[in-house]
Amino acid sequence: MFIIKYYYWEGNKIFSPLVHFRKRNINFLNNQNIKLAKFAGFCYGVKRAVETAKKLKQENPNKNIYILGELIHNTDVINELESLGIKTIYEVPEHGEGICIVRSHGEAPEVFEKIRNAGFELVDLTCPDVKKVQQKAIELAKNDYFVVIVGKSNHPEVMAIKANADLYSDKVAVATTIEELEPFAERIKAHKKVGVVVQTTQMVSSLNLVVNYLNTIAKEVLIHNTICQSTAMRQKEAKELAQESELMVVVDSKKSANTTHLAEILKNCTKTIHIENDSELDENILKNITNIGITAGASTPQVIIDKVINKIKGGI
């Protein structure tokens, strides 16, 4: 007999992670109806990170401010931060001075230590929701669960979650497909219990796929659905908007996990394009289209969304 336990996220109220709340804007121009998703743009974790980085520079104009890795996956925002004197670095130097920011995706514990040892003042802007996933993974590892992280192994958030769990267990796997789990199958079968956490920006379909497979090989499966509410609500609402749209425009970086997943979901619903900003809009794809839906990933600032809308309204 399989024992399956589901524990769903019990954090803030369901709408609180979302920064932008708006009615769908319906514009009529050139016989086109444009509808903007309510849940489009910065989530609260991204908004917090960007605003804090800018505030740090304002309060410390003479200090060097560094971000380890891109603060968020949006080129326009990174360029803006660079223009303010906030530099992105990809490795921690042996020696440094000033402030070093840990981005919203989080980092491995040894990276925090390395930053401090280098002489930097450390500012941790790991998203609170990501912190919760790390803590759940640690809790499972400490309680002798075989930990399965549903996520992309090369994504910085997942790498940080795994690094935290690895401190307490050598039984940790990362997967979004059955093929990625199969090498661990015998170890999972031999173990009494399996615990699951999820990358905050993953698709529910990936979680279900992994869980269904685990149910066939594990004796007990404990599932923490740690997909953040902003991701879940963004995907749900965008699917509903797609049902009444001939074309969906998804705005945000191609490197953004939550946005690529969003575009992937919508492509199964209606014609969909994924653009980083208004410069990538092609007038040919908008020809003979009456109903256009627009959504945006968690790393998209409002100014970029507005530029996309205005360009479509202006007939490109």
Predicted ranges, named:
Residues I4-Y6:
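N-terminal start and proteolytic maturation junction detector
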Residues F21-I316:
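The feature marks the mature, well-folded catalytic cores of soluble enzymes
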